[in-house]
């Protein structure tokens, strides 16, 4: 492309300080360096993680910053050493990477890349410790190596999944974080059998993606657990057959579920990050074969307490990160699941706004309205 090797000026939504509305600014985006790729972002979605680090409550504030990590785009140019991507390729940026060289990447059992595992505090490129974004010469920090709230961004090649160019980017962009996290937690980690009973704790976008995985796996009974009764109607679209609100019961919700299911559910997936829900997720599974999977990120001082007999009675507890998907290796196949109409993404996309109104997406999420709001960056 004619822009290769040159600085590109484009629009970006900049977070200047914690909790303040993003500002649409003209930024300069430098060319990609070794093992980097400059991507033209076409569609980007808002994830709760963006909101969490925008609010910057309880973490190191890194500002000014360009947030965003769920997106779909097209390769504009590549840096030295990049051989697997060329200009024009369609890609999904991912907040965590796959270098393909470390012990984790070489293991079939892990997706926790040593080099490119998520780093929320870095704010610069891993190669030279510099930002590729500037405004009037002043550096603007990156976010989790992606910074997709910009018309152009620079990303390490290991954090880009090359996908089918026929796949609509305004739909599959939501697969680059939350939906894959929930879907994979069920399909790759819990692995429910056809006809089994599955409980999903937390019915936000990630929990509903986990529920979609249970539906795809052929679970015959899918129990949604949430403190908001309004979530049940929406969850029915994802295969939910029963709904339990812990506030409606005097006994612990795990006891309610055990009674409902004649001894416990076959699989349970937790998508809340609340420690009580995590414990309940484990304690509600059936002895002998029950598997519980933890997805949510708890408070750093939270402590998981359960009786050791739960383990001795052959209940299994697992954790997962990004649904155990290796970004570059596995995400292209998740896109194909959508293309084959096995996976329905449209029902996750509840809102769409122009890039100039990106703050509306933040307002919707803060109010708990909708699941995913898509923004088209050229609007």
Curated annotation (Swiss-Prot):
NAD(+) binds at residues 49, 202-207, 226, 231, 272, 295-297, 322, 372. It is found in: Cytoplasm. One of its GO terms (biological process) is formaldehyde catabolic process. An alcohol binds at residues 49, 69. It is an enzyme of class 1 (oxidoreductase). It catalyses: a primary alcohol + NAD(+) = an aldehyde + NADH + H(+); a secondary alcohol + NAD(+) = a ketone + NADH + H(+). Belongs to the zinc-containing alcohol dehydrogenase family. Homodimer. This is Alcohol dehydrogenase 3. The lineage of its organism: Eukaryota, Viridiplantae, Streptophyta, Embryophyta, Tracheophyta.
């Amino acid at each position: 492309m004619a822009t290769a090797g040159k600085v590109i000026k484009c629009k970006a939504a900049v977070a200047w300080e914690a909790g303040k509305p993003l500002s649409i600014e003209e930024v300069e985006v430098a060319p990609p360096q070794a093992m980097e790729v400059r991507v033209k972002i076409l569609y980007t979605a808002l994830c709760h993680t963006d909101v969490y680090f925008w609010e910057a409550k309880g973490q190191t504030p890194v500002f000014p910053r360009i947030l965003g990590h769920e997106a779909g785009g097209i390769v504009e140019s590549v840096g030295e050493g990049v051989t697997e991507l060329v200009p024009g390729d369609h890609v999904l940026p991912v907040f965590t990477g796959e270098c393909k060289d470390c012990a984790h990447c070489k293991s079939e059992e892990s997706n926790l890349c040593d080099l490119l595992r998520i780093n929320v505090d870095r704010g610069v490129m891993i190669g030279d410790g510099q930002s590729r974004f500037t405004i009037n010469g002043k550096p603007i920090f990156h976010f989790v190596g992606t910074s997709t709230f910009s018309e152009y961004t620079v990303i390490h090649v290991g954090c880009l999944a090359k996908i089918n160019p026929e796949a609509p980017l305004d739909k599959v962009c939501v697969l680059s974080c939350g939906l894959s996290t929930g879907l994979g937690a069920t399909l790759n980690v819990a692995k429910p059998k056809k006809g089994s009973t599955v409980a999903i704790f937390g019915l936000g976008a990630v929990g509903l993606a986990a529920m979609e995985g249970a539906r795809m796996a052929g679970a015959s009974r899918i129990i949604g657990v949430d403190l908001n009764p309004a979530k049940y109607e929406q969850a029915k679209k994802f295969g939910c057959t029963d709904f339990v609100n812990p506030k409606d019961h005097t006994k612990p919700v795990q006891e309610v579920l055990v009674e409902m299911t004649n001894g416990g559910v076959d699989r349970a997936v937790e998508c809340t990050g609340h420690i009580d829900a995590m414990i309940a997720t484990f304690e509600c599974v059936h002895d002998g074969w029950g598997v519980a999977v933890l997805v949510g990120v708890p408070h750093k001082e939270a402590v998981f307490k359960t009786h050791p007999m739960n383990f001795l009675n052959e209940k299994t507890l697992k954790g997962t990160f990004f649904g155990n998907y290796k970004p570059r290796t596995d995400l292209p196949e998740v896109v194909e699941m959508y293309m084959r109409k096995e996976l329905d993404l449209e029902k996750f996309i509840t809102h769409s706004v122009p890039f100039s109104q990106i703050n509306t997406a933040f307002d919707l999420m803060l109010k708990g309205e909708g699941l995913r709001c898509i923004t088209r960056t050229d609007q």
